[in-house]
Amino acid sequence: MSQPCPCGSADEYSLCCGRIVSGERVAPDPSHLMRSRYCAFVMKDADYLIKSWHPTCNAAAFRDDIIAGFANTRWLGLTIFEHTWSEAENTGYVSFIARFSEQGKTGAIIERSRFIKENGQWYYIDGTRPQLGRNDPCPCGSGKKFKKCCGQ
């Protein structure tokens, strides 16, 4: 039975991010890497998350923390609202909202992730989280205030 890709593309997982997570295909840009990393969180694939972090981040040292985070978190959806990259500079940025539920409470991660490309491979480096006031417009583009949208 086919399974829809958790990234929200409407494609089957095996034809979408599953090909990147399995290593069959390399992420062609930071947006695809971000989507595949989100899928790895959904599928609880610590190995792929560690592999897709830049080696200087030493993500393997946090394997136990990554796995522990899987226990109580259910991922509800990913919205990418901005992505830019420069092949010439081998850098890219993806701004997203990842919704989740943890111990009965919903939440959202809003981040601008930074990526670097080395030897034909994109890697996640780190991210920054914007400081949003409750009355600010929601960055997802809904037109609602943050407090009535992703900030709930």
Curated annotation (Swiss-Prot):
Domain of life: Bacteria
PANTHER family linked to this entry: ADENYLATE CYCLASE-ASSOCIATED CAP C-TERMINAL DOMAIN-CONTAINING PROTEIN (PTHR33747:SF1), UPF0225 PROTEIN SCO1677 (PTHR33747)
Family membership noted in the UniProt record: Belongs to the UPF0225 family.
Protein name as annotated: UPF0225 protein YchJ
